[in-house]
């Protein structure tokens, strides 16, 4: 009888121990990221789905690409995010690797009474002249010539830009530098530039809010923000001289010829690409993570999150009009993870 009782106790203890071990093994590691506002809607959607699937959480701070680079460089987050790819020498200096996680489009948005969404037509040089302060009125002959039949008001244009360090601004100004020699020589490109005119909003959210509130305004935001905030967006003339509307198909067309393996850190810039359907201000958003992981469990969880998102998040991306990374690019990214991201002992964490 005593022997049987001891066996039962051992069995119960074993079950409790096994349960405790399983519970410990299943404990999820929460991770932190910070940076670009451009991909925030899709990262938030992926994070919610990933939490439900795995129990692991992501706290992503949508603070702008400049802030994301600062935080990952300072090692205060597990990964940074930027729409402006870091140069190879800067990645090397800071011990970082970079990979593209999602693609999308930056669109000009406007608040103009009587002009429907998608009705206004703009060229890159015209947008540059508006932000240079040369085209000041909505009924300027240059705008009217491109938009016959639209009742453009005799109203001042209020240009809205980004006040923070922004990858969206990098894509916007990189494009304008390609299509306007005057823009390139006076303002140039960057995550933050010295604007000639306009009011600044913080984040894509801030620009969207200003455009929604200010009658006669124009701004630039990632397409998901335009849709979420029900903002009117313009058609644009692309490199092939075709007028195109923003859509995931046209973003895909712009990315079709990208050679991700040819640039250090896969830092391909997709603005002003050829192709009849190409949207002219298309770009990728990049993830930055340290090669040498001082907290390998956190590093592993970052890679698990993006691995899961690449495999399971394509429809979510499509629903928000982002463009998921193609399978061959994902395989290239995974090979970089395997060969370059290691723990303190030099062992790969992927």
Question: Across the structure, where does each feature detected by a protein language model lie?
Answer:
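Bacterial N-terminal signal peptides that target proteins for export
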Residues: 2-14
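A general, composition-driven signal for non-globular sequence regions
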Residues: 2-5, 21, 69-70
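Extreme N-terminus of proteins, especially the signal/transit-peptide cleavage junction
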Residues: 7, 23-28
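Bacterial N-terminal signal peptides
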Residues: 12-23
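Flexible loop/hinge segments at secondary-structure junctions
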Residues: 28-350
């Amino acid at each position: 009888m005593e022997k049987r009782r001891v066996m039962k106790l051992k069995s119960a203890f074993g079950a409790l121990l096994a349960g405790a071990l399983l519970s410990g093994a299943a404990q999820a590691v929460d991770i932190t990221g910070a940076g670009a506002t451009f991909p925030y809607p899709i990262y938030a959607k992926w994070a919610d789905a990933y939490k439900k699937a795995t129990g692991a959480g992501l706290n992503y701070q949508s603070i702008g690409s400049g802030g994301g680079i600062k935080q990952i460089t300072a090692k205060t987050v597990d990964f940074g995010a930027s729409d402006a790819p870091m140069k190879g020498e800067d990645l090397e200096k800071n011990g970082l690797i970079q990979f593209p996680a999602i693609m999308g489009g930056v669109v000009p948005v406007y608040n103009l009474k009587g002009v429907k969404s998608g009705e206004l037509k703009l060229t890159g040089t015209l947008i540059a002249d508006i932000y240079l302060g040369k085209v000041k009125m909505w009924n300027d002959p240059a705008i009217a010539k491109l938009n016959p039949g639209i009742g453009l008001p005799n109203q001042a244009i209020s240009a809205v830009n980004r006040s923070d360090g922004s990858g969206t601004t990098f894509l916007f100004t990189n494009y304008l530098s390609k299509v306007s020699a005057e823009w390139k020589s006076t303002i140039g490109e960057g995550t933050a530039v010295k604007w000639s005119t306009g009011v600044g909003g913080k984040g894509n959210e801030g620009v969207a809010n200003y455009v929604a509130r200010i009658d006669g305004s124009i701004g630039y935001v990632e397409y998901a923000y335009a849709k979420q905030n029900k903002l009117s967006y313009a058609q644009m003339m692309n490199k092939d001289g075709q007028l195109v509307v923003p859509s995931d198909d046209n973003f895909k067309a712009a990315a079709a010829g990208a050679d991700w393996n040819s640039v250090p850190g896969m830092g391909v810039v997709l603005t002003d690409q050829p192709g009849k359907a190409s949207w002219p201000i298309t770009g990728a958003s990049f993830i930055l993570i340290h090669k040498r992981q001082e907290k390998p469990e956190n590093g592993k969880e970052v890679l698990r999150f993006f691995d899961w998102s690449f495999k399971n998040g394509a429809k979510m991306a499509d629903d928000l009009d982002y463009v998921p990374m193609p399978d061959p690019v994902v395989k290239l990214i995974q090979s970089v993870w395997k060969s370059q991201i290691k723990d303190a002992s030099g062992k790969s964490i992927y």
